Every structure is written in structure tokens, then in C-alpha cells.
Amino acid sequence: MNNRLDNNRTIRAPHGDKISAKSWQTEAAKRMLMNNLDPDVAEHPHALVVYGGIGRAARDWPSYDKIIATLDRLEDDETLLVQSGKPVGVFKTHSNAPRVLIANSNLVPHWANWEHFNELDKKGLMMYGQMTAGSWIYIGSQGIVQGTYETFVAMAKQHFAGSAKGKWVLTGGLGGMGGAQPLAATMAGFCALVVECDETRIDFRIKTGYVDIKANNLEHALQLITNACVKGDALSVGLLGNAADVFSTLVKSGVTPDVVTDQTSAHDPLNGYLPQGWSMEHAAKMREQDPKAVVTAAKQSMAVQVRAMLALQQAGAATTDYGNNIRQMAFDEGVTNAFDFPGFVPAYIRPLFCEGIGPFRWVALSGDPEDIYKTDAKVKELIPDDAHLHNWLDMARKRIQFQGLPARICWVGLKDRARLALAFNNMVKNGELKAPVVIGRDHLDSGSVASPNRETEAMLDGSDAVSDWPLLNALLNTASGATWVSLHHGGGVGMGFSQHAGVVIVADGSDEAKQRIARVLWNDPATGVMRHADAGYDIAKNCAKEQNLDLPMLNEE
């Protein structure tokens, strides 16, 4: 019997101010776990898969049921330990300790590869937590929209004199992460052609407002893109097809996009990438019958796609890796120049990381969108002079549909995270919000990840692979009193290529929450400034001095 699949389950988080757990801290963790599996949020909820190939919220359905039951009975001086999606222990701690500590997908380095992980996964001994799937803070495609938007805005500034009008992006993948690309591109002023091999994903993104239109074929797609570019409109087009096929066809046809990237689930060649010439049904069958053949065929197709991306770069397209490790997969297949195009973090995002700026997010446990709109207004009030941020919030309200519990993503840094969260806590206390707010972030943040092919690619001092930093981040957030803390391996880029930590805290309006928020949401982004200052970035050093961070090795500079 497959205890990971239950087609009869439909999970939705409770809304409102009535709780069944013993406190809002544990009620929040329960609701966020359930929200990760809401059919409006998750990619394959019946199989516990949230996003990113096989990124799960719990190891299996018995584990899920036991986590829910345990959170309902957990006392305010107890901590639940979750090991790769399975609840393994409840221990007496104290009221300011985290209520849940999570470790997902972690393997001793020598064994940290997909082959060994897949053996353990098949035996039911592990699960892949991705980043926010197994740490219960996924908010649907909105969670990555602003980061993608910031990247596209930076590309327009660097390559097109600040204007994306009449320019278009070619990319692949419309899963939980890739699905953000078309909306982010059009928000930034680009047109976007997104290739996806699963038609249900195109339809889902159209339904949720992330894709504007579905093309019948490549010729139709290019006609739609060309017409929109000529008019100066920003249009997103979903095209059913194989990314390796379509990218290669464009090269042969001499059609050069302005921007090229990719967000297929290339990080997981077994479960995340469809080989050329294969149907979805054939791939599903082969995963059971001959997984090694699937991996081989998928990586060969990735090599074809990356060669096409390199050719488009040579033809003049601004080309970047969007963090799915496709360059590494192609390199392993003999594409020796796969890394000739850069990753998006060193190319466009790192200056933000140097100031601790990253994907801050919050969720209204009331389930009422008005609570999010009120917090949007509070952000504008507290950060009055940031026109770019205000523009983002305005666009988000108009164009982003909530998935599951209403949520907002907003890239802010060390200067602002704690004071925004404290304001939200005060709004809960005063009754301005109908229920508490959950505050967290992606693991893709300035101080919480080591990923040499993504977030820590091309660090100034060569410390790309040093993973002490996310471990220190998780330890500090635990000591600071976060509500739940997670430590994962392999998110984004796959097994053996990343380690990363997550943090979530609940603003329940209490004075105790106020104290915890002040510690956690200062210390967490401060570790990002620390990490980049230690690597020698002047922006980070200046930020550390301005914010009076105590960094012993830098204090005398």
C-alpha cells in the first residue's frame, strides 16, 4: 500500500480566530502545514507534494496525521521534533523555545547524492523537503514572484537602459516556482514565453492569473509575442512543449529572445525533468521500471537545452541560470562551457543580500484578505519613501491572487523586518487584525543558505561552499525564540548542492511575542549582513557599521 498517496483527501487550513490547539503558536504551525497541502496551493497535494519536483510537507499520510494530532496537544513548554517529515519526539523545553524543530533531507556529505537519497526515500526513511515545502511556509507562486520581479527589473536596468518595453523573455517551467516567471516578467514590463510539458500546469497558471494566454504551437506563440512587443504590451504566453526542443528550435530558426532563463525542475533529473521525445505517461512508467534510464535521458536533454541557451547567449540574449542547477547537470554531461552564463544571484541580486534584504513574507491566519490589505498599508506607512516597494505592493494587490490563506511577499532587509513585524503584532493586539499573523521567509535569503551554484555562487572570497553559515543561522534563530526553525539539504539545486535554514515566528499580539519578534527578526537578517561582510563586500560592511552589528573581526576596520 502506498501511504504517500490518498486521492480522497482534501486539506484546507482552518480560518478565523477559534483554535483547537493549546496556543496560537502551535495552531499557527498546524494551519501552515495544512495550508501547504491546500489544493489551491500545492502542486500534487494528494501525494503530499507541495512544489519543486517531490518537495513534500510530510513524509507520508500517517506522519501527517500524527503531526497534526501532536500539534493540537503540544504544551507551551514543549518542542516537537520532526525528522524528514516524520514526528519523532516531544521534549520539555521552555516557553521561549521553538515549538517545532525540523530537519529535512540531511545526509552525511559523502552520501549526499540523489542515488542514495532515492534509496532511502523509497524505503520511507526520508523525504525531500525542498525549501518551504517541508518547513510549512509555502504561500504558492507568490512566494517567488517578487524575487523574480526584482531580477527582471535588474536585468532591464543592466541590459535595456531600464525599460523592458518591447522586450521578451524565453524560459521553461510552470511549476510552483517557475509559475511565478510569467507574472513577474509582465510586472517588470517584459513579454514572456514559458515552455511547459504538463498542460495541467499551464491551465492552473492561467486560472490563477500568472499566465495570460495558452498558445497552440510555437509559431502561434511567437506571433503572440511579436504582436505584443510591437504594441509595447506586456503579455505572457504558455506553450505546451519540451524546453530542450523549443529552445533548440529557436536557435535553428535564428529567433533570438532578449532574455533567456529556465525554471524547470532540473535539480531533480528523476522526477523533475521530462526527457526529449518522452510523454508524461511514459516518464511516469519508466520512473518505476528503470529510474536510472530516466536520469540518463533527462540529463542528456538538459545538455541539449543548455547548449541552446549558450547559443542564444552568443546571439545576443541576456542569459542567466535561475537556480535550478541545470548548468551543473549539463556540465556533468560534457557541456564544458555550461557555466559561461551566470547565476541570477551574483548577476543581479547579491547587492540586496548584502543589506539583509530578501523574501520576507507573512500570512493572515484569519483567512481574511482584509488583514493582508491592512498590513500592506502599514508597510507603506512605516516605509514612506520607497516608491519601488510601494509600486510592488500596489501591483501585488491588483495582480496576485491569494492561494490558500492570504499572504504577502515583500523584499525588505535588516533595517525593516523587525519593526514591520512588531507593528503587525501590535495590530493583532489592538484588534485591527482579526487573528494572528505568521511571519517567515524563503530559505533563499541572505544568511540562511550555502549553495555554490545559486545563492552563494562566485562569492568575493571564494567561500561559496562553506555551509557553517546556514547552521549558525538556524542555531541563532532557535536561541532567539522563533516559533519553528528548519534545517534542510538539497533545496532548489538538488542533493549535494545546498544546505539551508528556515525560520517562522507568530505575531499573536502578546508581549512575549513582541520580545521574541524583536530578537528573531533582527538577528535573522543580521546573519546575512554578517555573512557578506565576512566575505568582504563593502555594502555589507557599511550596513553592519550603520546598524551597529558587533562583528569582532570587522570592528577595528
Swiss-Prot record:
* PROSITE patterns per UniProt: UROCANASE
- List the gene name: hutU
Which residues take part in binding NAD(+)? Answer: 52-53, 130, 176-178, 196, 201, 242-243, 263-267, 273-274, 322, 492
Keyword Cytoplasm among record annotations: yes
Q: How is the cofactor bound?
A: Binds 1 NAD(+) per subunit.
Per the entry, what this protein does is: Catalyzes the conversion of urocanate to 4-imidazolone-5-propionate.
Instruction: Please name the GO terms of the biological process aspect recorded for this protein, alphabetically.
Output: L-histidine catabolic process to glutamate and formamide; L-histidine catabolic process to glutamate and formate
Provide this UniProt record's keywords sorted from A to Z: Cytoplasm, Histidine metabolism, Lyase, NAD
**The reaction(s) this protein catalyses:** 4-imidazolone-5-propanoate = trans-urocanate + H2O
The GO cellular component terms are: cytoplasm
User: Needs which cofactor?
Assistant: NAD(+)
Give the metabolic or biological pathway.
Answer: Amino-acid degradation; L-histidine degradation into L-glutamate; N-formimidoyl-L-glutamate from L-histidine: step 2/3
The active site consists of C410
Tell me its family. Answer: Belongs to the urocanase family.
Where is the protein localized?
Cytoplasm
Q: What is this protein called?
A: Urocanate hydratase
* Species this chain originates from: Pseudoalteromonas translucida (strain TAC 125)
GO MF term (any one): urocanate hydratase activity
Q: What class of enzyme is it?
A: lyase
Q: What EC number(s) is this enzyme filed under?
A: 4.2.1.49
